[in-house]
Amino acid sequence: QRSFRDRIIVVKFSAEWCGPCKKIKPLWNEWISIVSSNIVIVDIDIDESIDLYVQLKAKKMVKGVPTILAFYGDIMRDQWYIPDDSVSGGNEGDVKNFMNRCLIKAKTLIQ
């Protein structure tokens, strides 16, 4: 059983009605089909988890939707809820760059 230390947790906040979410959905679906086994994907529809979304937005962790957060298991911190990387909005270039950073980091964790 692997520990969290060699994993990345990626959490995406989106909504069915969100235009930018729809724009990046094909890119997201393609990416999650090729991610390494040490990347754990959590996909949250804010309409189904509004309390969590409101709480994270109040902490300025989520600016809006879509927002994707990455938590690296090899970084020790007191405030575990602060992401190590993130991207917000529907800019496909920004989302691709975020995804590439996650893939690169994931490879370093299993070497």
Question: Model-predicted segments: where are they?
Answer:
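Structured loop/turn residues at beta-strand edges in well-structured enzyme cores
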Residues: S37, K60-K63
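Short active-site neighborhood of thiol/selenol oxidoreductases, capturing the structured segment around
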Residues: F4-E16
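Short cysteine clusters
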Residues: C18-C21
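Compositionally biased low-complexity segments enriched in polar/charged residues
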Residues: F4, V42, S49-L52, A58, ...
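Short coil/turn segments at secondary-structure boundaries
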Residues: K23-P26, Q55-K57, A70, Y81-P83
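Flexible, charged surface loops at secondary-structure boundaries
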Residues: R2-R5, V35
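Non-catalytic, surface beta->alpha helical segment in thiol-disulfide oxidoreductase systems
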Residues: K63-Q111
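Thiol-based oxidoreductase modules, predominantly thioredoxin-like and allied folds used
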Residues: F13-S14, K25-I32, S36-Y53
